């Protein structure tokens, strides 16, 4: 039987050489606090391309300065950021990988000086700053900032854009009734709470015709929060808008007890793939090639997003191939070892 983990996957005009995706993970390493890439970022991402990862998604990258989780996050709110990202995309592609970027706004989870913003003036927890409720004008401005960030990502040479609508950040905050208590057109019903994400998707697509992913938190793990049924509905709307893949994570909107085990989020990807009829990515404690192959062979997801295991092992693709008794190409410089 062919090893599906090492088969290509094509979305629009982008072909990823295998099904392994480096999930976006914040490195908090923009030490000049200007949102720009540092030498560490170049080494970090390029090394995973050398390690034969099919698609590398750059960590949550803020569309405005107050949209950062911390002041050491990456940013793409200025044309000054384009040059660094262009160098990164060129080098990653030179090693045979595709590269995407996750566009993000931290919302009420921003840990910054000055005002922070959210759909409603509800802090993340008792220790967190209370955000200012966004005005309609600020919402429209933020949507335009996502659009401008997408245009910069295109100029920098990215293959794929992912919108971050998970983990309790701004887009997720609009979606969930736990964090969105608005009474205007951006709050209340499912349709209204989806409006911010939906309008952002439309704005991004005005300047971006490449593959578009959205990361979601498929469950808030608490009463009156979002669950998988809600996200199946949202995924259907995203598909209608032209989103190509749903990256299925979960949690982090509020403090919650989560039963974590290997592959604990895979069922979310499976259900959305089946019921919304859209491609999905599975993520969360997927640490072996055997586990990844099972997910793909049973059509539970289309791509495997690997996070911490790729921090531990930049050559995860090689390790997975050995586990699956299959051969994959190696960088010519590494032939003597592989």
From Swiss-Prot:
One of its GO terms (biological process) is response to toxic substance. Keywords: Detoxification, Flavoprotein, FMN, NADP, Oxidoreductase. Its EC number is 1.6.99.1. The keyword Transmembrane helix does not apply. It comes from the Bacteria. It catalyses: A + NADPH + H(+) = AH2 + NADP(+). It is an enzyme of class 1 (oxidoreductase). Substrate binds at residues 28, 164-167. CDD domains: OYE_YqiM_FMN. One of its GO terms (molecular function) is FMN binding. InterPro entries: Aldolase_TIM (IPR013785), NADPH_DH_bac (IPR023663), OxRdtase_FMN_N (IPR001155), YqjM-like (IPR044152). Its cofactor is FMN. FMN binds at residues 60, 102, 215, 307-308. Homotetramer. PANTHER family: NADPH DEHYDROGENASE C23G7.10C-RELATED. NCBIfam families: PRK13523.1. Belongs to the NADH:flavin oxidoreductase/NADH oxidase family. NamA subfamily. Catalyzes the reduction of the double bond of an array of alpha,beta-unsaturated aldehydes and ketones. It also reduces the nitro group of nitroester and nitroaromatic compounds. It could have a role in detoxification processes. This is NADPH dehydrogenase. It comes from Bacillus velezensis (strain DSM 23117 / BGSC 10A6 / LMG 26770 / FZB42). The gene is namA.
